[in-house]
């Protein structure tokens, strides 16, 4: 009997590229995106292959930056079986042991989920391109999906305080977006949400958590480099960062990526 092998749809998909537009991460820079035709629903096998090639999902769109003279959007992933918490992460873990984890489907989201999302955007991202929030935006961004996404929810008794949207992959989980109660600053919920996703991937015996793009010249994205070891898709290959970079090293890496040429960045700390 022949064993069933899942078939990738990679070669059957139609790709498009956007015109230049303002970069969401770097001031005074333009960006372009390659994206899949959103009319096609893709399976886990295909999304997994695309993730290993540096693609991300947002709502029904699966995309990858394709920018002129800039390659700073580095896809990042954490090898969860090797991950070790730093002191800050250990404190966040200990501080949130009173929370309960629940798993749900985005399609089952209620007014409670939207109210938390609305407060989060209003109070944490009022200067971003997702402000002002709306129900339509919430549904297109987090409820609509071209794959079988799920929510990892954190509850304090009967109060929802954090939601992480995840995509299942054949080698891990893709961390799509997290929103949480902005009044719970002491808890470091953003940190704890990533730690819970790492734990969930470990429990499923998966290899990676895909954290999305790390942009060295964007301070708001530098938190991703706190999760060590961290693998970066650099010059077409996944390379491992085994310790946290200094601010100077981050700046040097960012400078080397302001070109379409291979970075040639051969620091021994990235293997």
Can you say where each PLM-predicted feature lies in the sequence?
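Terminal substrate-recognition subdomain of acyl/acetyltransferases
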Residues: 1-103, 208-271
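Short polybasic/polar patches that bind polyanions
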Residues: 51, 122, 202
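A conserved beta-strand-loop-helix scaffold within acyl/acetyltransferase catalytic domains
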Residues: 56-70, 75-186, 226, 271
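Residue-level preference for non-acidic, small/hydrophobic
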Residues: 117, 194-197, 224
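Nucleic-acid nuclease catalytic cores
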Residues: 173, 177, 181-187, 204-217
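Conserved acetyl-CoA-binding loop-helix of GNAT-fold acetyltransferases
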Residues: 186-198
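Conserved acyl-CoA
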Residues: 195-207
